[in-house]
C-alpha cells in the first residue's frame, strides 16, 4: 500500500469512528489532535443540520444517556487512530506532526492539516490550546480575561515561531 493509500484508509477510519460516537444526525465535525511521543489529547465539536451551534464531544454521554465507560472506550479508539496516523509519518521518514486538524462534513468533504509546534515543551496547557483553537477556528474568545490573555500569548508565541 502506498503512503497515500494508507493515509486514506486511516482518514476513513477516523471519520467513521467519530461518526459512530455522535448518536444524532450531524452536519460538520471539527476535530483537533495534539499528540507527541509522550501522549496527547483529541477533542471534537460538531454541528447539527440547520444549526451553526457547536456541540462539544464530552457532552454526548450526558445529553444522550450513553454510558461514560462506553464513550471513553470509543474515545480511546479514536486517540489510537490518531497515534497510528502519526506513526505512519514516522514509518515514511517524515517529520511526525504534533497537531492535526481533521474536519469533515456529512457530504464527505474532508480537510486535514498538520502542524509541528512543540506544544508539550511550551508553557501552554490543554485549556489554553483548546481556547486558542476555538478562537482561531471559530472566532470564539474565552469568557475570562485571564484566558483571553493566554489566547493572545499563544497567538504571539506562534507569530514568533513563524518569523
Curated annotation (Swiss-Prot):
Recorded GO cellular component terms are: cytoplasm
- Entries under InterPro entries matching the protein: YezG-like, YezG-like_sf
Question: Which protein are we looking at?
Answer: Type VII secretion system protein EsaG
User: Where is it chiefly localized?
Assistant: cytoplasm
What this chain does, per the entry, is described as:
Component of the type VII secretion system (Ess). Also acts as part of toxin-antitoxin system. Counteracts the toxic effect of EssD via direct interaction.
Stretches of the chain forming a coiled coil according to its record = none
According to the UniProt record, which cysteines are disulfide-bonded?
none
Assembly mode: Interacts with EssD (via C-terminus). Interacts with EssE.
Q: Tell me which domain of life the UniProt entry assigns to the organism this sequence originates from.
A: Bacteria
List the Pfam families hit by this protein, alphabetically: YezG-like (PF04634)
Keyword check for Secreted? no
Q: Keywords on this record?
A: Cytoplasm, Virulence
Q: Where in the cell is it found?
A: Cytoplasm
